[in-house]
Amino acid sequence: MSYKSGFVSVIGRPNVGKSTLLNTITGQKIAIMSNKPQTTRNTIRGVITNKECQLILIDTPGIHKPKTKLGEYMVNVASETIKEVDLILFLVEANTQPGAQDVNIIQQLKQIKTPVFLILNKVDLISKDKLLAIIDSYSKLMDFKAIIPISALKNDGIDLILKEALDYIPEGPQFFSEDMLTDQPEKVIAAEMIREKVLLNLDDEVPHGVGVEVTSFKEREDGLINIQATIYCEKSSHKGIIIGKQGNMLKKIGSAARYEIERLLDTKIFLELWVKVKPDWRNSDNMLKTLGYKTNKN
């Protein structure tokens, strides 16, 4: 059989486990995770390479009704991505009937010719009878090329996705080297890991208004990497929460982020964090550009 290579998009509404699925398939944490919706803001590409094929999996932001320019950017990224891939994995929760957001995504999928797999995540949380009922509900909405129940967290059903995907991936060369797991620059990964720790440690109101910019990423002669990063928030009160009493929260965020970045880069780092207030930055084209989000004006 000839070698195959292609692009696979993982889409779905916010917080259904898209980043968990990407991390499980690649066997490495390359996408940040939290239980808060809209954690993923950019497309993140994970690379899987074996003797038969190379698959480039694209984790997209959750499709939702946007309230800011950042939200509009996230939805546009997800919507445009599905037009440029060889296969789409539509990820839903196995224990939930199709909702308005799911139906909206399906309407978009029906307008393109790209094959779509229905992937039902969190199958370990539901009985077989209820699962079959939910599968039936989705089957009435669209003709999926494959329907695969999985548990991304427990690595259950993942091999079946890869096996079935081969039938829809074209012949082609390797786009990336065999040892490459993601095309994300190290600077971007570092910023995302810092943002993840903010998401995990703070209340719901603050994280949605937080962006992270790595302002310096330099390797020293002794092999240590110096990283300087700024955490942007929209309110002075949020700045105080992020820093915490006597700086304890910022220290906690920095310590957790440093551990994660060191594990990913396989080297020691020195991490410095600052917190700055930028009111309404999620609606600022200049700030979105600074943080790496492409808008219609850049």
UniProtKB/Swiss-Prot annotation:
Occurrences of domain Era-type G (ranges): 4-171
Location within or outside the cell: Cytoplasm; Cell membrane
Keywords associated with the record: Cell membrane, Cytoplasm, GTP-binding, Membrane, Nucleotide-binding, Ribosome biogenesis, RNA-binding, rRNA-binding
Nucleotide-binding is among the record's keywords: yes
One cellular component (GO) term of this entry: cytosol
PROSITE patterns listed in its UniProt record: G_ERA (PS51713), KH_TYPE_2 (PS50823)
Record-stated family: Belongs to the TRAFAC class TrmE-Era-EngA-EngB-Septin-like GTPase superfamily. Era GTPase family.
Name of the protein in its database record: GTPase Era
Organism: Ruminiclostridium cellulolyticum (strain ATCC 35319 / DSM 5812 / JCM 6584 / H10) (Clostridium cellulolyticum)
